[in-house]
Regions:
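Disulfide-stabilized extracellular ectodomain repeats and their linkers
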Residues: 62, 86, 117, 197-200, ...
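Sec-exported extracytoplasmic/periplasmic mature domains
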Residues: 58-61, 67, 94, 106-110, ...
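Gly/Gly-Pro-rich "capping" loops immediately C-terminal to redox-active cysteine motifs
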Residues: 43, 54, 68-102, 117-129, ...
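Post-cleavage N-terminal segment of exported redox proteins
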Residues: 1-48, 104-113, 131-187, 237-240, ...
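Sequence/structural segment immediately N-terminal to covalent heme-attachment motifs in c-type
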Residues: 46-78, 165-173, 184-208
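C-terminal functional regions that serve as terminal interaction/effector modules
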Residues: 225-281
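Solvent-exposed, polar/charged alpha-helical surfaces in well-ordered, non-transmembrane soluble domains
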Residues: 51, 55, 87, 99, ...
Length: 282
């Protein structure tokens, strides 16, 4: 009986070990796979590009991940998920052309080999206009190469499982976002829709209907805000009632403070109209 039990335990241990190895190898194949890279055309930057590029880099979260000096930093230190190192952009700018940087930003792939840039919100940044992208790149190139290269990212078990199940599939998020864009409510609300697509969709989903991965709710909730309450939310992260909204509160205080009054007004006009349309359609 004792020998049989030992054999069973050893057999189960061996089977579990083989399963773990198989899952690790399978996830590594998916993580290191390469993707086709579409050509990008870079636009010449306007005269005011660096100053506006600095503001846009803050608004789009570039400096939140890559650091105020753009020299890179750890932005997800959880070893069970993914230890992400946002790369040193001052070194990347010296190595890549504007067209290649545009490929990384809009397609979420590394120009040198076509591998996925894990954590790069290309599904949101793909909406940048050529002029917006040119200004961001002008700001990046205003920094001389400095600092060290960041270490490669390290995927933990939770991330590997998410890759195997399809929950994490970075480049394909771009295709999914293209297939499910934010609702088009006409030219008068186009400016607000563009802001929602380039800023809000990272956490709230490409169609703004909520995102299970990032945790952002359906922005239909904006229908409960008046213009003043929404302005307060965007600038302080505090909703009516004073609740702490987690990452929304943090991002509003760190990044959204650079929104112009016109941008907040345009965003509110679009999101409130979207909420009204969805309510009427129910």
């Amino acid at each position: 009986m004792g020998r049989a039990l030992v054999s069973m335990v050893l057999g189960a241990t061996a089977a579990a070990t083989l399963l773990i190895v198989a899952l690790w190898i399978s996830s590594e194949v998916l993580i290191t796979r390469t993707y086709p890279i579409a050509p990008e055309v870079a636009q010449a930057a306007p005269a005011h590009a660096v100053a506006e590029g600095r503001r846009l880099s803050k608004l789009y979260g570039c400096t939140s991940c890559h650091g105020a000096d753009l020299q890179g930093k750890v932005y997800n230190p959880n070893p069970r998920l993914v230890r992400n190192y946002a790369p040193n952009l001052t070194l990347a700018a010296a190595r890549y052309s504007d067209e290649q940087l545009a490929q990384a930003i809009r397609q979420g792939v590394r120009p040198s080999d076509g591998r996925a840039l894990w954590g790069m919100p290309a599904q949101t940044l793909m909406h940048l206009t050529s002029e917006e992208l040119a200004m961001v790149l002008a700001f990046v190139r205003s920094h001389s190469p400095a600092g060290a290269s960041t270490p490669p990212e390290s995927a933990g078990w939770r991330a590997r499982w998410a890759v195997l199940t399809g929950a994490l599939d970075e480049p394909r998020r771009v295709a999914r976002a293209q297939a499910t864009p934010a609702m088009d409510l006409g030219p008068k609300l186009a400016a607000g829709r563009h802001i929602a697509s380039t800023v809000c969709s990272e956490c709230h989903g490409s169609d703004l209907g909520g995102d299970d991965v990032e945790g952002g709710p359906d922005l239909r909730a904006v229908g409960a805000y008046d213009a003043q309450a929404f302005d307060t939310l965007m600038r302080t992260g505090v909703p009516p009632g004073g609740r702490h909204l987690g990452i929304m509160t943090l991002v509003a205080r760190s990044d959204f403070k650079v929104f112009t009054q016109a941008e907040v007004a345009a965003l509110y006009a679009y999101l409130s109209a979207r909420a009204e349309w969805l309510t009427a359609a129910d």
